[in-house]
């Protein structure tokens, strides 16, 4: 819309001037008790928020579109807009309109975006909300990606050497917003990722010298070595851009960010975004959260910090056996001391979100209720510790402090945690003495502090509460001292408080000063009345001013102890995660796995935790599984619906849980440490990217073949679909061969397939073992037993599965007839072993050693030797008969 066509008032001039600095935002412009929006912003906000669109000067030739929301309800409207991908700039009045001599001064105090919000109402308490920044240097072919949860201050990042790996991490973390240099060309598929991409100028955001300066200032350190970034130039540039963007949106220093630590990938089992999706760790395949996901089964956390730590641990399971065993030992201890765990759970339920509370305190966005929540949490801290160091005497229900000998039975990691415990009792007591139990919604409303916290504030509060009685007391005093029983006290807006004396009521004393003469009375004031009036009329404003001053002083003190608060938040999160995993183990009868340094996997009566939680333990059929150096690849055959995919997924999930330090859904499990877990399971077209099911499958398979090592675990389901039978079979064969022979030791692989020809690999390659899912026929019905047994399936049972799926009986009967005819009239394909010249240990090496020769059919050879010019019709006929016989003989072998 062209603003020049409208009559621009001084107020609108101010609006447009401010708006010009924030062109990509919706400007919430404070006017009294409302935030107003004008021009295109008003039209957009009215449409998105479903509020009335009006006009300023509606009778003008070109009225200015406008809409508004009440200031006290602005948070909910802003939340709606940022959830829809908009940015909102909040423009406040910076001076009191009563003191302003002209136009009230205003300025933007904050910019809201989807990744930078800190308001509790806009955040999922148990999920991180990340802001990301990426940078790729074409000259050195190195890229970096960093991500920060602005609401907690947690941030980290990585530096990589492949663009594909960079985008794998971006899709795994999935930040709400991703910052990138505006001249960088995003891949064509980027627009399909659920991320807001924010282009930024290179010079002002990513340039190295500025990035270093900005990063060091934000972190309060002298050099990059303090952050472990001295060798991560590209990562520094990404971090610098992230800090710059935060400064632009928060409009203040961003010193609330925790000390930066690059993510040490070597410490963790790597799960790419495809594996997380296929295993349904956080979302179901349809994209929905909740029931049907692994985190839904695991999440018995009782605090927001614990919930977010569970999310982190599921993203990044450990590789270090010592760390895993330490965490297992705590779960064992909690399961053994169930009463103590119950006390711990009761205490944790009262804990608020210390990380996000402390961030709002630092950013000066805290509310009185935030302070009350902090106080209540600090007062609970002793109970949390006592839950673990106090023994319950069941007989008489007494609590006894555990002596040193019993304390020594605690796992070392738990005992060390308790020795570092800080109740922050000094500030718990201070807040308890200071804060009223029923605080106002906003600090400007007053009533935050208790009586007795501050003498001056007490006096003001006493005035406000007892003002009428003080006026009455002064009246009674004057009546008595001056013998004026008919003296009255009153108030009006012009003269304020006054004494009123009728002409017949008596003579006014000398200290009475006349204020107003009426027909039958006089109104007076006194020094004492004026003093009381001044104190009464200014008490509310003075109280609010003093409370705000005391509030800010208290807030600054809390900022100084934020490291202590965050440290305790991390301990509480760890305790909460431990109790959650212990609780899951008790509820679902999970057992402690043994971690191995070799590549073996042994699972007895393993179960899929998500499916079991839905259908019930009594219904779910558990399975055993063994992988060792003679069984590096398990080729699993069987019909659809028999349970092949379930076995694959549950094996990967059991391995993942073991690396989290969790117990696992199995009677017994021995798990060799993994460096990566890969999952290529299920079919999915990506039509928006122009990728068929087959293309998606091959891309995922290619990633596995390039990145898997002998320490990895790979689960593959139905490689080679979506193309011709022989193409698919050849690809599946080659993939299996590559995985079995990789790095000489092979990759631990579970390979489910319908290509029964692949079972021949068991005879030729060491490490391949065939398995199938047991089925039975009962009264011409196919019964799935869901039990994994040795050997290949005898056939595919496709028609039987189709009947179970509800395909009409007429179609089923016709399919059976056609199948019988095909089996009778078509020669069976030769064994794949006979088709192939031999199984090669390394296809690439084999091809490099020899030329690939095409063996001609004998008929083709004879045809080439024939000379048509000398051939008689009779000879030609004889040749045709001979060739036909020869063709039939060769095709019968």
Swiss-Prot record:
Domain of life: Bacteria
Keyword set includes Metal-binding: no
Protein name (record): DNA mismatch repair protein MutS
Family label: Belongs to the DNA mismatch repair MutS family.
Keyword vocabulary terms for this entry: ATP-binding, DNA damage, DNA repair, DNA-binding, Nucleotide-binding
PROSITE patterns, sorted: DNA_MISMATCH_REPAIR_2 (PS00486)
Binding locations of ATP: 638-645
MF GO annotations: ATP binding; ATP-dependent DNA damage sensor activity; damaged DNA binding; mismatched DNA binding
One GO term (biological process): mismatch repair
SUPFAM superfamilies on file: DNA repair protein MutS, domain I (SSF55271), DNA repair protein MutS, domain II (SSF53150), DNA repair protein MutS, domain III (SSF48334), P-loop containing nucleoside triphosphate hydrolases (SSF52540)
A GO CC annotation given for this chain: cytosol
Pfam families (alphabetical): MutS_I (PF01624), MutS_II (PF05188), MutS_III (PF05192), MutS_IV (PF05190), MutS_V (PF00488)
Family annotation (InterPro entries): DNA_mismatch_repair_MutS, DNA_mismatch_repair_MutS-lik_N, DNA_mismatch_repair_MutS/MSH, DNA_mismatch_repair_MutS_C, DNA_mismatch_repair_MutS_clamp, DNA_mismatch_repair_MutS_core, DNA_mismatch_repair_MutS_N, DNA_mismatch_repair_MutS_sf
Signal peptide interval: none
Function: This protein is involved in the repair of mismatches in DNA. It is possible that it carries out the mismatch recognition step. This protein has a weak ATPase activity.
């Amino acid at each position: 819309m062209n603003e020049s066509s409208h009559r621009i008032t001084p107020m609108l001039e101010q609006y447009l001037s401010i708006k010009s600095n924030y062109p990509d935002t919706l400007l919430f412009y404070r006017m009294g008790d409302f935030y107003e929006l004008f021009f295109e912003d008003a039209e957009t906000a009215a449409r998105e928020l479903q509020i009335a669109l009006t006009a300023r000067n509606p009778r003008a030739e070109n009225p200015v579109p406008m809409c508004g929301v009440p200031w006290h309800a602005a948070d909910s409207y802003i939340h709606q807009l940022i959830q829809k991908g908009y940015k909102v700039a909040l423009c406040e009045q910076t001076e009191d309109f009563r003191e302003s001599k002209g136009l009230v001064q205003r300025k933007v105090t904050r910019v809201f975006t989807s990744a930078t919000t800190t308001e509790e109402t806009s955040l999922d308490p148990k999920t991180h909300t990340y802001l990301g920044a990426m940078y790729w240097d074409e000259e050195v072919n190195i890229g970096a990606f960093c991500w920060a949860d602005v609401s907690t201050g947690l941030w980290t990042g990585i530096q990589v050497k492949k663009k594909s790996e960079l985008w794998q991490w971006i899709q795994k973390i999935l930040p709400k917003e991703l910052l990138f240099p505006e001249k960088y060309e995003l891949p064509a598929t980027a627009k399909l990722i659920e991320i807001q991409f924010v282009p930024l100028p290179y010079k002002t955001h990513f340039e190295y010298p500025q990035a270093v300066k900005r990063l060091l200032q934000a972190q309060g350190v002298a050099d990059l070595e303090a952050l472990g970034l001295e060798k991560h130039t590209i990562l520094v540039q990404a971090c610098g851009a992230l800090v710059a963007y935060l400064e632009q949106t928060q409009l203040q220093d961003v010193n609330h960010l925790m000390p930066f630590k690059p993510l040490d990938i070597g410490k963790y089992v790597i799960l790419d975004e495809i594996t997380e999706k296929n295993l349904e760790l956080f979302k179901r395949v349809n994209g929905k959260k909740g029931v049907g996901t692994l985190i839904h089964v695991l999440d018995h956390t009782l605090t927001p910090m614990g919930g977010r730590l569970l999310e982190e641990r599921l993203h990044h399971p450990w590789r270090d056996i010592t760390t895993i065993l330490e965490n297992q030992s705590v779960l064992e201890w909690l399961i053994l001391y169930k009463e103590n765990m119950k006390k711990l759970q009761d205490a944790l339920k009262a804990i608020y979100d210390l990380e996000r509370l402390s961030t709002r305190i630092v950013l000066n966005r805290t509310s009185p209720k935030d302070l009350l929540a902090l106080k209540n949490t600090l007062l609970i801290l002793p109970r949390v510790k006592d839950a673990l160091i106090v023994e319950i005497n069941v007989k008489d229900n007494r609590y006894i402090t555990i002596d040193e000998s019993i304390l020594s039975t605690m796992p070392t990691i738990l005992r060390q945690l308790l020795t570092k415990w800080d109740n922050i009792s000094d500030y718990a007591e201070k807040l308890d003495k200071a804060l009223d139990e029923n605080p106002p919604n906003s600090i400007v409303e007053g009533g935050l502090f208790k009586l007795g916290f501050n003498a001056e504030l007490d006096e003001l509060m006493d005035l406000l509460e007892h003002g009428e009685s003080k006026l009455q007391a002064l009246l009674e005093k004057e009546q008595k001292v001056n013998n004026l029983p008919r003296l009255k006290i009153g108030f009006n807006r012009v003269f304020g408080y006054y004494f009123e004396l009728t002409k017949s009521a008596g003579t006014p004393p000398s200290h009475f000063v006349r204020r107003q003469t009426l027909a039958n009375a006089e109104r007076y004031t006194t020094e004492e009345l004026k003093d009381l009036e001044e104190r009464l009329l200014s008490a509310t404003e003075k109280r609010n001013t003093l409370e705000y001053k005391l509030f800010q002083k208290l807030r600054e003190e809390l900022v100084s102890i934020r490291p202590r608060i965050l440290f305790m938040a991390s301990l509480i999160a760890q305790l909460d995660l431990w109790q959650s995993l212990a609780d899951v183990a008790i509820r679902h009868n999970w057992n402690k796995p043994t971690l191995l340094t070799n590549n073996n996997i042994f699972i007895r009566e393993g179960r899929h935790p998500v499916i079991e939680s839905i259908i019930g333990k009594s219904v779910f059929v558990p399975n055993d599984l063994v992988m060792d150096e003679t069984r590096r690849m398990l080729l699993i055959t069987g019909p659809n619906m028999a349970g092949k995919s379930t076995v694959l997924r549950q094996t990967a999930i059991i391995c993942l849980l073991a690396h989290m330090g969790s117990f696992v859904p199995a009677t017994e499990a021995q798990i060799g440490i993994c460096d990566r877990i890969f999952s290529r399971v299920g079919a999915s077209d990506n039509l928006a990217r122009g990728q068929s099911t087959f293309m998606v499958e091959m891309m995922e398979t290619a990633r596995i073949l390039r990145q898997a090592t002998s320490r990895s675990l790979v689960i593959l389901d139905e490689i080679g679909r979506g193309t011709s039978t022989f193409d698919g079979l050849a690809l599946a064969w080659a993939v299996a061969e590559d995985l079995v022979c990789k790095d000489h030791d092979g990759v631990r692989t579970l390979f489910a397939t319908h290509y029964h020809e692949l079972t021949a690999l068991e005879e030729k390659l060491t490490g391949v073992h065939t398995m199938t899912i047991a089925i039975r026929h009962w009264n011409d019905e196919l019964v799935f037993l869901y039990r994994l047994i040795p050997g290949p399936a005898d056939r595919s049972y496709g028609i039987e599965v189709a009947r179970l799926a509800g395909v009409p009986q007429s179609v089923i009967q016709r399919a059976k007839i056609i199948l019988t005819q095909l089996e009778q009239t078509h020669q069976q394909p030769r064994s794949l072993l006979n088709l192939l010249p031999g199984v090669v240990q390394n296809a690439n090496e084999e091809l490099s050693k020899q030329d690939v020769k095409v063996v001609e059919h004998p008929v083709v050879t004879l045809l080439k030797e024939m000379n048509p010019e000398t051939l008689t019709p009779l000879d030609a006929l004889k040749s045709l008969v001979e060739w036909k016989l020869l063709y039939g003989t060769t095709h019968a072998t």
